From Swiss-Prot:
One of its GO terms (cellular component) is paranode region of axon. Keywords: Acetylation, Actin-binding, Apoptosis, Cell junction, Cell membrane, Cytoplasm, Cytoskeleton, Membrane, Phosphoprotein, Tumor suppressor. This is Band 4.1-like protein 3. It comes from the Eukaryota.
Length: 1087
């Protein structure tokens, strides 16, 4: 096991070479083997000289010591080579020696700069593929901090928003662009700082709270600011010494966003009283007072509620808080929250049902974007896990999981306290730095505070997660100015791309161009991304100018003047024409953006981009296409693969999938709003939003509630009602179009009548609810929702007076064509029998004959109110319901087919159907013409009699003008009629408290109980409110009786009132509403 190096060793005898070369190899290997004794070396030299003097070489006698030395050297060399073989698997140098052709990359290291809580900077190097925990451990080791679970690192993303660095993920996957700059901050504010084990932990918590106060994130009163400032001075400077402390010894400190001389004087006065207090005691007193502040440890996020009102969502140790205008309006403790989730930019909280609630409620909030919703969701998950759980929840390990795999990976508060109790090191020595970082007179949002509580703007404009020091703010402003100046120098005059031929779609978007390049060197994708980043600016318009090229410029120059750039997430195509030596070359080239939009979010789930951001379509086309729909990409992919699997033709699938996806996305919001309008009461439009108004009573006895929607102004109600009615008109038009298509393809009369019967239910009920009358709609057993717009009146007397009134509403739909426009200029003859109708069509925009079945709806509704008078008043018998017919309006050409509606009491009842100026006149004419057909007269004797809601369906067939101009006349003989009789009685007590709606009460609880039998459905809604210290309970019952036999409604009403009084003897009945709806056969209606 010896090695020979050099030619001299070859000439020596083997016996002499062995020990010497073994020693030389041993020295080269660096093995710590002792050298041979000097006597042995001298003896060997003498023997070698003696042997060299003779002509014949004499063999040297090898002593025992030399043999042992050689054997020991050989063993050492074998051991060293064995160690080298083991290290070769790990050492890059061994890899190079073993495989010299293989190039081993050294791990790249990134320089990280961390801003600490005292304003200083800490710089370190970490590997590029390191996880966040590595950097966080280095920072905590630098700070000599053991209780590090309360702290974290933050960074800014591309949108300049602060995010918490996830210690379980690689840093380069989180900080995707820019330098690695971080801030060290408190992440979880301990509810009881006295339970922290070390003073150094409390010191850094104090530094964070001082920054929160100065930045405006932690608002305080003047007295609290002075007290906390005095503890700060005591901790930093020690006892007050009049000899050393001048009048301005605290001028370098910063105590509040709006620092005043009065505040300094108060701080000095309180500082004198803290004599003898150690810095640790001063910091403890500081924390004991700071933890009592209402915004202590609250991480605020901008959001909007379901009505679009700007609010702030705060996450803290106790739960979720909701703020509006700096006031907390609601609180959801963690035990109350059942589930938190987000979808796109919506954030949802599912609330656990309370004591008097049967089902859980979900409250939704809208955040600025998807990333903000995800950021808020992560903060909630981390806070809930840290403060509420004993052990962190392990992330799901399934291959396919629904929802995000993100879980809090650190230790919980319980684990941290157990670990802190085991700390046995002596108290670390640390130097408390002076608060010179607060010397700037401006608050951290860049504006000088104007008042004691002028912190709302600071809270709303600054990022509410971490601390920003004035030095860093100034540095960031300087960096932004330098970037703007650099961009201004680099941007060249803009030249547009000239588009010719068959590509009109390209070139309609605004895109700045890259600076011209005079060389033709190949450009790598990295260089493209760098240049794209340098030219990252967008223009409002597209200026047409001609792009000129050099004759010798190559066709695929990737950085030429004709190079469009649409942004970081856009793919730009360049269409360029070059002329040189009589040849024309057309080239399409693809410019890579700085970073392709990833279809996977941080958790590995699909998140499709918004196609409106790509600007691949002109603005005029984007206005008509649902390109902003987030469902467009999923719909396109689904339809494409479906068609591809069915037809095995890629062109066929591509041709049909995009138009079909556009149609689906176009119909998606309309279908959702249509179903919501047909299924829900317009006055219940805020029903889902009022779930957030349920009270939250926490364990500490604090109760907060939101303001009820019932306290909104009447003007807002009117505006919402008008909007709802306009939407109903649009939906009615869509229904007529669907009905027309249905009737063209169907010939079954029974099916047609059933279709008409179904269509004739919802529009009447919806259109008739125009006035804000306290009326309950006819309920089917499935409809048990409580209308939130109804007001209950206080009083004790029932049946004192019955006042009868009629509020008829006539709903006559129009005949629609394929373009959803009304038929123009139609005259109608109506015979006295009212059965045969002969319409003459003068003009129809269709060239083919259409048979349209029209639904004509007439509803007459009568409401009787009970008041305090003891006499009966007869109903107005002069008004009669009009039989529907088509009325031609004499006027200018193009006037639409009108509908009539009666005016009673100056109210326009038919406003929700169509707003026509001739409504009242047409209604009177029709009423006079057809008074003989339907005559209603009634007298009220001992109980009121009603003739209500008549729904009639006529089948009217007519044809269009033929190409030759021949007029076609078609008359109908069969008139299927469906009659629905509806009666509504309202009893109200006479004693009405005038201050009922003026003073809002605090909603304590709300309970809904539903019990259903074969023929009766009873819904009980119990509402408890606190008004002026007085608890008030209101119980509202809805009883729906269904059956084939006749039902005595008077007896049922009396029985219901009797049961209510028996069940609640200490309560009074204030309002009774009876709504009767019976369906009679067509034979009875014709009689």
């Amino acid at each position: 096991m010896t090695t020979e190096s050099g030619s001299d060793s070859e000439s020596k005898p083997d016996q002499e070479a062995e020990p010497q070369e073994a020693a030389g190899a041993q020295g080269r290997a660096g093995a710590p083997v002792p050298e041979p004794p000097k006597e042995e070396q001298q003896q060997a030299l003498e023997q070698f000289a003696a042997a060299a003097a003779h002509s014949t070489p004499v063999r040297r006698e090898v002593t025992d010591k030399e043999q042992e030395f050689a054997a020991r050297a050989a063993k050492q060399l074998e051991y060293q080579q064995l160690e080298d073989d083991k290290l070769s698997q790990k050492s890059s140098s061994s890899k190079l020696s073993r495989s010299p052709l293989k190039i081993v990359k050294k791990p790249k290291s990134m320089q990280c700069k961390v801003i600490l809580l005292d304003g200083s900077e800490y710089t370190c190097d970490v590997e590029k593929r390191s996880r966040g925990q590595v950097l966080f451990d280095k920072v905590c080791e630098h700070l000599n901090l053991l209780e590090k679970d309360y702290f974290g690192l933050t960074y800014r993303d591309a949108e300049n928003q602060k995010n918490w660095l996830d210690p379980a993920k690689e840093i380069k996957k989180q900080v995707r662009s820019g330098a690695w700059h971080f801030s060290f901050n408190v992440k979880f504010y301990p509810p009881d700082p006295a339970q922290l084990s070390e003073d150094i932990t409390r010191y850094y918590l104090c530094l964070q709270l001082r920054d929160d106060i100065v930045s405006g994130r932690l608002p305080c009163s003047f007295v609290t600011l002075a007290l906390l400032g005095s503890y700060t001075v005591q901790s930093e400077l020690g006892d007050y010494d009049p000899d050393e402390c001048g009048s301005d010894y605290i001028s370098e400190f910063r105590f509040a966003p709006n620092h005043t001389k009065e505040l300094e004087d108060k701080v000095i006065e309180l500082h004198k009283s803290h004599r003898g207090m150690t810095p640790a005691e001063a910091e403890m007193h500081f924390l004991e007072n700071a933890k009592k502040l209402s915004m202590y440890g609250v991480d605020l996020h901008h959001a909007k509620d379901s009505e679009g009102v700007e609010i702030m969502l705060g996450v803290c140790a106790s739960g979720l808080l909701i703020y509006r205008d700096r006031l907390r309006i609601n609180r959801f403790a963690w035990p109350k929250v059942l589930k938190i989730s987000y979808k796109r930019n919506n954030f949802y909280i599912k609330i656990r049902p309370g004591e008097f609630e049967q089902f859980e409620s979900t409250i939704g909030f809208k955040l600025p974007n998807h990333r903000a919703a995800k950021r808020l969701w992560k903060v909630c998950v981390e806070h809930h896990t840290f403060f509420r759980l004993l052990l962190p929840e392990a992330p799901p390990k399934k291959f396919l999981t629904l929802g995000s795999k993100f879980r809090y990976s650190g230790r919980t508060q319980a684990q941290t306290r157990r670990a802190s109790a085991l700390i046995d090191r002596p108290a670390p020595y640390f130097e408390r730095s002076s608060s010179k970082r607060y010397t700037m007179s401006r608050s951290l949002d860049g504006e000088v505070g104007t008042g004691q509580y002028a912190t709302t703007k600071g809270i709303s404009q600054t990022n509410l997660i971490t601390t920003v020091t004035p030095e860093k703010k100034a540095e960031e402003e300087r960096d932004e100015e330098e970037d703007k100046r650099r961009k201004g120098e680099e941007v060249t005059p803009i030249s547009a791309i000239r588009h010719e031929g068959k590509s009109p779609g390209l070139g309609t978007d605004s895109c700045p161009l890259s600076p011209p390049s005079t060389h033709c060197a190949p450009t790598s994708p990295t260089e493209l991304r760098r240049r794209c980043k340098e030219n990252d600016c967008k223009l409002p318009g597209y200026e047409p100018s001609r792009a000129e090229h050099l004759p010798g410029e190559p066709a695929l120059d990737s950085d030429g003047p004709g190079r469009p750039y649409l942004g970081d997430q856009d793919v730009a195509f360049s269409y360029r024409q070059q002329t040189g030596k009589g040849t024309t070359l057309f080239s399409f080239s693809l410019q890579l953006p700085e970073s392709f939009p990833s279809l996977l979010d941080d958790d590995g789930y699909l998140s499709f981009p918004n196609l409106s951001e790509t600007n691949l379509l002109p603005q005029s086309l984007q206005h008509y296409l649902p390109i902003r729909s987030p469902s467009l990409v999923p719909c396109f992919l689904f339809i494409f693969f479906f068609l591809l699997s069915a037809s095995f033709s890629v062109p066929y699938a591509l041709t049909l999938s995009f138009p079909l996806a556009l149609c689906l996305c176009y119909l998606e919001p309309k279908a959702a709003s249509l179903s919501a309008s047909l299924d829900n009461d317009p006055s219940d439009s805020s029903e889902e939003e009022t779930d957030s108004e349920r009270t939250d009573t926490a364990a500490d006895g604090e109760t907060t509630a939101t303001e009820s929607d019932q306290e909104e102004d009447a003007e807002l109600k009117a505006q919402e009602l008008e909007k709802t009615q306009d939407d109903l008109m649009k939906h009615q038009t869509n229904i007529s179009e669907l009905k027309r298509t249905f009737l063209e393809t169907s010939t079954d009369t029974a099916v047609t009548n059933e279709w008409e019967k179904r269509l004739s239910t919802s529009p009447v009920r919806l259109a008739a609810r125009q006035e804000d009358a306290p009326m309950i709609e006819p309920l089917v057993p499935e409809e048990t929702k409580q209308s939130s717009g109804e007001k209950l009146m206080d009083g004790s007397e029932i049946f004192s007076l019955l006042e009868s009134a009629r509020k008829p509403t006539e709903f006559i739909g129009g005949v629609t064509s394929t373009s959803q426009s009304w038929v123009q200029k139609m005259e109608t003859k109506t015979e006295s029998s009212g059965i045969e109708t002969e319409p003459t069509v003068h003009h129809l925009p269709l060239s083919t004959e259409k048979v349209v079945q029209e639904t004509v709806l007439v509803e007459e509704r009568r409401v009787v109110h009970a008041s305090g008078d003891a006499s009966y008043s007869a109903g107005d018998s002069g008004d009669a319901a009009a039989q529907p017919a088509f009325t031609g309006i004499k006027g200018k050409e193009g006037s639409a087919l009108t509908e009539g509606a009666k005016e009673e009491g100056g109210e326009e009842v038919a406003k929700a159907v169509l707003e026509q100026e001739e409504t009242a006149a047409a209604s009177r004419e029709r009423q006079e013409e057809q008074s003989a057909a339907i005559h209603i007269s009634e007298t009220l004797e001992q109980k009121p009699h009603f003739e209500s809601s008549t729904v009639k369906t006529e089948t009217i067939s007519f044809g269009s003008v033929s190409p030759g101009g021949v007029k076609l006349e078609i008359s109908t003989k069969e008139v299927p009629v469906v009659h629905t009789e509806t009666k509504t009685i309202t009893y109200e007590s006479s004693q009405v408290d005038p201050g009922t709606d003026l003073e809002p009460g605090v909603l304590m609880s709300a309970q809904t109980i539903t019990s259903e039998t074969t023929s009766t459905t009873t819904t009980t809604h119990i509402t408890k409110t606190v008004k002026g210290g007085i608890s008030e309970t209101r119980i509202e019952k809805r009883i729906v009786i269904t059956g084939d036999a006749d039902i005595d409604h008077d007896q049922a009403l009396a029985q219901a009132i009797k049961e209510a009084k028996e069940q609640h003897p200490d309560m009074s009945v204030t309002k009774v509403v009876v709504h009767k709806e019976t369906e009679i056969t067509p034979e009875d209606g014709e009689d």
